[in-house]
Swiss-Prot record:
Organism: Arthroderma benhamiae (strain ATCC MYA-4681 / CBS 112371)
One Pfam family here: PEMT
Catalytic activity: a 1,2-diacyl-sn-glycero-3-phosphoethanolamine + S-adenosyl-L-methionine = a 1,2-diacyl-sn-glycero-3-phospho-N-methylethanolamine + S-adenosyl-L-homocysteine + H(+)
Chain ranges on the Lumenal side, renumbered to this chain: 1-56, 102-166, 216-248, 293-364, 408-440, 485-543
Pathway(s) this gene product operates in, as recorded in its UniProt entry: Phospholipid metabolism; phosphatidylcholine biosynthesis
Protein name: Phosphatidylethanolamine N-methyltransferase
Primary role: Catalyzes the first step of the methylation pathway of phosphatidylcholine biosynthesis, the SAM-dependent methylation of phosphatidylethanolamine (PE) to phosphatidylmonomethylethanolamine (PMME).
Primary gene name: CHO2
Length: 952
């Protein structure tokens, strides 16, 4: 990470050297000496407006006001007032700071604010309009960092981050203080609580608070102030993500286990109000993590790797490659060989987004779920029905663990599942697809039957305030949420291949990678993955549900020990990790005697497992007799159009601007001109799908520096005077540094270039007299000077769809339209089968594939923004990589293929094909399959239509 994020690299070396020293130091190196020297220097330095230990008096004063307010308010107002106070500070944290960080990550907004306001410019230069603010900030920051820091010489990114830290300190301190005061206001002792429960409640609560404190301190020890205050949102250092200490124990410890203290305080306060507001605050923090931090981490530290480029060694090899694509009956029916022998995941099963009712597995699951729901809702909750629902759940759990485990065990030792399909002439890919359907159906029915049984056994409490009814429901819901989160994390780490035990079916298994939740736990499904069944048992308080939970947990552990673990040891051997991050952290903290005890327990468990395996191996032939396998045969895409949101902002006074000086014209050097109409009186400008569009504009010399140009579809805006529909990011500023977003300047080539323009004798300054097309008046007089500029719209600033569009020039950051460009069209050319030589046989696709490649390559290059890093230069060169969450390039290609060839693919198909050659082969075969249903004639054999011309 040798560059700054979204801002230019500072020339100052002090920042880099200071961080480089910190990086070179060991993580656990003591720093007391350095801190002591800094403290001594700070003691000698005169401090104004700060306490002797360096804490801001303003922050302490606001905290003190909170405490005073607690004692001044009457008792009946304390709880609501401090609830509002805490929620306000929490909103300032999660919404306020979250918005600032989001804008800084994507647009460098805070750094742009600092540049625009010039608050860090030395007043001696005469360019700083706020000299007093400059002096105040300088005094504050130099007091905060007494050594190794120069306010004048530090990069603007670093100074901006330091000011941001002061705001964060205020919000975080007030957030925690208001929460503690709210807990004090709500604190009480239950009337029926005995002394033993009181002691237990306080001991556990204090333990959670101390654990929370240790997590925060250890996290700060590892990440230091740079990551603690989100420094990488402002600038980057040559350092990767750190996983040490508490970061080895749990994912995002400051947001997960780092909130244990909130629940400890709730326990000590013995208040459900504190508990519920703690859950709300914790949920808001997770939303902050998901919406702000995770996207920035993915963008900064987990960028996709550079693509592999194909280099042709010599012309002879290229000639052989071309000749190999000639039509032949033996080669054309076989797809290009995949460089990886693993199955391509193009039609996933797991998740609502992958639901496909055309697939028999999904439709069967939906029908069975409806049946379960109907039976559960329409039958009474009598003991006999409860018994049958619990029995049904137990049977499905046995099948899910024992039956599926038996199939996987046979597949691991003798490949029985794959052999069955090979026996009937099918491939191992077909066996894999059928297995995925069987496992997915079994898992769904197992949990559906469990939920139905829990519903039958559940009864609403008659009195929610009696006993622990509320607490049991809260804890139960928390355990269910924990299992859902664990399952999602496992799927994100393993993918479709690992979720369905792909290494049981394919020998070419990928190398083990311990990422995601597996960084901390070897088998998260052993405990966390079954937390939800215990949550249901806790909510229902039913002995039958406790039995089901115990059965589920026992069978789950047995499945891991008897099926998964032996196969993993056989497949990966010494590549398996012995201890996960959490276990390593716990072992490091254990005394030697406990470590010896742990080793003895491990040996006993290993010997017991070996004994059970020997018994099962002996009984397997008898158990296998008469056992048969069950076989089952195995999208809708929604195109979302942007909402028409009115966001009109109008400048009331346009006096002083010559409307005839405003013009906007589309550069026609890259467009295709087509005659429109029989008399050829007009021309239609047509641009290729995805090609960059250059725009030239002119404006008066006194035009606003906040003018901007937007791209709109014709018909979106009913008015030619005012734009009332959002551009959805498809706009470019006319001048640098005018808006709080670096994206607004993306595409800006030149601005405010003074040029000469012929004048008009009847110059009008009324908005209604403007020329929307930017054409000059016929009555010409002496020329005058105007400002001009050029910009290019490309990538995300284009409409990735066909249609007729226009550019609009807007005034002063508002939506007054000063000029409108000539309409132009974005079009995808239809692929004409008539271009293929007529001698191509019906069973040979060589020329067809080549023609499709030639037609498709420039479109695909446009879809990848013509970026040399990701855009293919040849049909054989692979596409660039993109993350799972951002499929914009694949979506563009899917739309282009659909419009060009009339064939609709999923985005996963484009990603799996990987290059234009494979995609062209797939299109060619899809056209052959769909030829009998096509509305156009085909060069191949098809049913005669009896018509003399093609249907349009």
């Amino acid at each position: 990470m040798a560059r700054l994020s979204g801002v230019e690299r500072p020339d100052d070396s002090g920042l880099r050297e200071r961080k480089a020293k910190a990086v070179e130091e060991p993580v656990k190196q003591p720093v007391e000496g350095a801190d002591g020297a800094a403290a001594a220097a700070q003691a000698k330095k005169k401090t104004i407006g700060r306490t002797p230990d360096g804490t801001d008096i303003l922050v302490l004063s606001i905290i003190g006001l909170h405490i005073v307010l607690l004692y001044l308010l009457p008792s009946f107002l304390r709880i609501p007032i401090f609830a509002v106070l805490f929620l306000s500070w929490r909103a300032a944290y999660n919404i306020g700071i979250g918005w600032l960080l989001h804008m800084q990550s994507n647009h460098s907004t805070m750094v742009l604010w600092a540049r625009q306001t010039k608050i860090f410019v030395n007043p001696a230069t005469g360019d700083n309009p706020h000299p007093q603010l400059y002096s105040f900030i300088k005094r504050e920051l130099e007091t905060k960092i007494p050594e190794d820091y120069s306010f004048e010489d530090a990069p603007i990114e670093y100074n901006t981050w330091l000011v941001f830290r002061r705001v964060v300190d205020l919000i975080l301190m007030c957030d925690f203080t208001s929460y503690c005061l709210f807990a004090i206001a709500c604190g009480s002792r239950p009337a029926e609580e005995n002394f033993l429960v009181l002691i237990l409640r306080w001991v556990v609560g204090l333990g959670l608070v101390l654990f929370n404190l240790w997590v925060k301190l250890d996290a700060h020890r590892v990440v230091k102030d740079f990551a603690w205050y989100w420094g990488d949102f402002f600038y980057l250092v040559d350092q990767e993500l750190t996983f040490d200490g508490v970061f080895e124990m749990a994912p995002h410890p400051m947001y997960s286990v780092g909130y244990a203290g909130y629940y400890g305080i709730s326990l000590m306060a013995a208040s459900y109000k504190v508990l519920f507001i703690s859950i709300l605050a914790h949920a808001a923090q997770f939303a902050f993590l998901v919406l702000v931090e995770n996207p920035h981490i993915e963008k900064t530290y987990n960028a996709p790797p550079p693509r592999k480029r194909t280099i042709e060694s010599h012309a002879g090899l290229a000639g052989e490659e071309k000749s190999s694509r000639r039509p032949s009956e033996s080669s054309e029916m076989v797809p290009p060989p995949s460089p990886v022998a693993l199955p391509s995941s193009t039609h996933n099963l797991v998740g609502v987004k992958n639901l496909d009712l055309h697939r028999i597995t999904d439709s069967s699951i939906i029908l069975i779920q409806v049946l379960f729901f109907a039976l559960t809702m329409l039958t009474p909750s009598t003991p006999i029905y409860q018994f049958f629902f619990v029995l049904n759940a137990a049977i499905w759990r046995l099948w899910y663990s024992v039956g599926i485990g038996y199939i996987l065990n046979c597949q691991s030792h003798r490949r029985e599942w794959t052999r069955h399909f090979v026996k009937f002439g099918e491939t191992k890919e077909e066996a894999w697809n059928q297995w995925k359907g069987t496992y997915h159906l079994s898992m769904t029915l197992c949990y559906a039957s469990f939920i139905a049984a829990a519903w039958k056994m559940y009864t609403l409490p008659e009195n929610w305030g009696y006993g622990l009814a509320i607490l049991k429901h809260v804890l139960g819901a928390g355990l269910i949420a924990l299992q859902i989160w664990t399952s999602v994390s496992i799927y994100d780490s393993l993918g479709e291949f690992g979720w369905f035990f792909g290494d049981f079916f394919f020998d070419e298994a990928p190398k083990l990678t311990y990422s995601g939740i597996y960084r901390f736990l070897n088998n998260p499904e052993r405990v966390l993955g079954l937390a939800g069944v215990w949550g249901a048992a806790l909510i229902t308080s039913s002995r039958a549900m406790i039995f089901l939970a115990l059965l589920s947990h026992t069978l789950g552990i047995a499945f891991i020990q008897l099926v998964e673990r032996p196969h993993m040891q056989k497949l990966y051997g010494r590549g398996l990790r012995q201890d996960a991050g959490l276990v390593r952290s716990i072992k490091r903290s254990l005394p030697p005697s406990f470590k010896q005890l742990h080793g003895s327990v491990d040996r006993i468990l290993d010997e017991s497992i070996e004994f059970i395996e020997e018994v099962l191996d002996t009984a397997r032939p008898k158990l296998a007799a008469g056992v048969t396998t069950f076989v089952k045969d195995t999208s809708e895409l929604f195109h979302k159009y942007p909402a028409r949101i009115t966001i009109t902002r109008i400048e009331p006074d346009l006096a002083g601007y010559d409307m005839n000086d405003y013009s906007i014209n589309v550069d026609t050097s890259d467009c295709i001109t087509i005659r429109d109409g029989a008399e050829d009186k007009s021309e239609v400008l047509v641009f290729e799908y995805g090609s960059p569009i250059k725009v030239n504009w002119t404006a008066p010399l006194n035009h606003s520096k906040r003018d901007w140009v937007g791209l709109y579809m014709i018909g979106q805006n009913p008015s030619r005077e005012v734009t009332n529909v959002s551009s959805w990011g498809r706009w470019v500023a006319t001048n640098h540094g005018s808006f709080d977003s670096v994206l607004s300047e993306k595409g800006l080539i030149a601005s405010d270039v003074v040029v000469s323009k012929p004048g008009t004798s009847n110059t009008s300054k009324k908005p209604s007299a403007k020329s929307s097309s930017g054409k000059k008046s016929s009555t010409s007089s002496s020329s005058h000077e105007v400002a001009s500029g050029q910009m290019v719209f490309s990538g995300d600033k284009l409409w990735w769809t066909q249609g007729v569009f226009e550019f609009r020039y807007h005034h002063n950051g508002k939506h007054n339209v000063m000029a409108t460009s000539r309409p132009f069209e974005i079009r995808i050319p239809k692929f004409d089968d008539g271009q293929i030589p007529s001698h191509v046989s019906s069973n040979g696709n060589g020329f067809m594939t080549t023609a499709i490649e030639q037609a498709l390559l420039p479109i695909v290059q446009n879809c990848f923004d013509r970026d040399p890093e990701i855009s293919p230069q040849t049909a054989e060169e692979p596409f660039g990589c993109e993350t799972e969450g951002d499929l914009k390039y694949a979506k563009r290609v899917v739309y282009a293929v659909h419009q060009m060839f009339g064939i609709e693919f999923a985005t996963e198909v484009v990603r799996a094909d990987g290059n234009v050659q494979n995609l062209a082969w797939r299109i060619c075969n899809a056209k052959k399959v769909l030829a009998p249903y096509s509305m156009r004639k085909s060069n191949g054999a098809s049913t005669p239509t009896g018509e003399s011309e093609e249907m349009k």
